[in-house]
């Protein structure tokens, strides 16, 4: 995949860049693996805003992705590489030898016609190779391997490293835990029985995309972000004042929580004991 720069025929297109979508082999999704997506606009079941600055955007179909990779021991052929509007990564449509179809995240190097497999074949004991797109428990993955779509709890499905271009590295194994270096720099313990997929998530040039205009953000369902100092005092702790005031206090959230450098993580959180090195720590 490469990034295409547009001709500056307008102010909005002057700095705009788009993907060339050269890896895409089909435009329409597999109908049996799609469901309608109801827009929530950042509201919860009571209709109250729980995620600000969400709403609008283009209508989408949700593609059902296999994050668990629990169909073990059966080979699958990559039928197509497709675009998914619900995520930054591309997705691959797999045709299993028993006739089932599933979507997975498309890693770097996976192309149409490749064969992938998960886990171990129960009939002949064959283990999936260390190749992009193959999924294995981390106890069977060599130290130093680049992985993505990593489970935090066995059987729950991949939760880490699912965005375009992301990956973690398996740096060590200690007893029942594997040590992973995550994209943030954090080193974390995960059970070796958790499943991960070999390789780096594809569409690595996504970070080079420049939207170029506000309208492209609106297409994605992102609404404008209003500064606290531009609000009224009823709406924000920094609001109000005569003329262009600075807010009169250190930057805070709309609920008064310090916004710059204040640690918000619960010190008693159980998973803290699994974090060997925090992100940003030298």
Curated annotation (Swiss-Prot):
It comes from the Bacteria. One of its GO terms (cellular component) is large ribosomal subunit. PROSITE patterns: RIBOSOMAL_L2. GO terms for molecular function: rRNA binding; structural constituent of ribosome; transferase activity. Residues 265-282 have a biased composition (Basic residues). GO terms for biological process: cytoplasmic translation. Residues 230-282 are annotated as: Disordered. Transmembrane segments: none annotated. SMART domains: Ribosomal_L2, Ribosomal_L2_C. Keywords: Ribonucleoprotein, Ribosomal protein, RNA-binding, rRNA-binding. Pfam families: Ribosomal_L2 (PF00181), Ribosomal_L2_C (PF03947). Gene3D superfamilies: 2.30.30.30, Nucleic acid-binding proteins (2.40.50.140), Ribosomal protein L2, domain 3 (4.10.950.10). Part of the 50S ribosomal subunit. Forms a bridge to the 30S subunit in the 70S ribosome. NCBIfam families: rplB_bact. Belongs to the universal ribosomal protein uL2 family. One of the primary rRNA binding proteins. Required for association of the 30S and 50S subunits to form the 70S ribosome, for tRNA binding and peptide bond formation. It has been suggested to have peptidyltransferase activity; this is somewhat controversial. Makes several contacts with the 16S rRNA in the 70S ribosome. PANTHER family: LARGE RIBOSOMAL SUBUNIT PROTEIN UL2M, RIBOSOMAL PROTEIN L2. This is Large ribosomal subunit protein uL2. It comes from Desulfovibrio desulfuricans (strain ATCC 27774 / DSM 6949 / MB). The gene is rplB.
